[in-house]
Amino acid sequence: MKQITIASRESKLALWQTNFVKNRIQSELNIPCEISTMKTQGDIILDQPLNKIGGKALFMKELEVAILSNKADIAVHSLKDVPYQLPQGFCLAGFMPREDPRDAFVSNKYNSIDDLPKGAVVGTSSLRRKAQLLHYRDDLEIRDLRGNIQTRLSKLDNGDYDAIILASAGLIRLELVERITQFIPVEISLPAVGQGIVVIEALERDNDLLEKIQKLNCRESSRVATAERAFNQELKGGCHVAIGAYAELDNNQITLMAMVASSDGKKILKRKMIGDDPTKLGKLLAQEMIALGAYKILES
């Protein structure tokens, strides 16, 4: 293979992730790479909540079109932005090692969620984060917050919010860890499916490329991500519902924690299950939670 072209979004975080993959391909597979950057609809439409304009797939479509039209060979994504169902013909070819999966509390005035005064304004665009925050602190005011990490931090620094919630992984990767005031415990805010994992997307038919990319695959990331995504797929969850799932691997045993909540945080269901087959584990936990009324909670 002469060269691999990688499709990427233009944000600093997207380019960090893409360059991370590029460097691994070049150093470990000895294949030269080039990056092709592009704006996605998710980057352009910033004045509306994601769940109102089409969901997470808006961050991927242009990259997938580039692959289909032979302008790129692979695309690099944050796994938490990847819907549970990919377009026909695409697959997840490689999972990178997971960064810290927790949500980050970022504030210039307060040290933690517990320190926030009644009525404090917290920014997040995630229904999952909003629901869990309101469940923990129903006296907070949650306002929508879109844009890349730098844009969101600027809005906080300008005084638009008392605090904002971001993914710790993105701040760590951009060397902004000093902005994290509190790593939010998973008991308070269970992460999004796949949070902290960078993933490579490719065409299923490209066997030669898939075989090469597979050599970069992190087995632990792949197994925990498969469990989390199987749970999400069984529930048919997207960014229009408050769903969280986080798996940990110990030897060959996977512990999967999951949460569904009403958008106002008043109703919440949390469960945990242990198993060694990630797909089966995710499905079984979802089925258990469906039997306990998960859909009724999500619909409310």
Swiss-Prot record:
Catalytic activity: 4 porphobilinogen + H2O = hydroxymethylbilane + 4 NH4(+)
Cofactor details (free text): Binds 1 dipyrromethane group covalently.
A single GO cellular-component term on record: cytoplasm
Miscellaneous: The porphobilinogen subunits are added to the dipyrromethane group.
Gene Ontology BP annotations: protoporphyrinogen IX biosynthetic process
SUPFAM superfamilies, alphabetized: Periplasmic binding protein-like II, Porphobilinogen deaminase (hydroxymethylbilane synthase), C-terminal domain
Gene: hemC
Key words of the record: Porphyrin biosynthesis, Transferase
Function recorded in the entry: Tetrapolymerization of the monopyrrole PBG into the hydroxymethylbilane pre-uroporphyrinogen in several discrete steps.
Keyword Transmembrane: no
Enzyme class: transferase
Record-linked Pfam families: Porphobil_deam (PF01379), Porphobil_deamC (PF03900)
UniProt EC number: 2.5.1.61
Protein name: Porphobilinogen deaminase
Stated family: Belongs to the HMBS family.
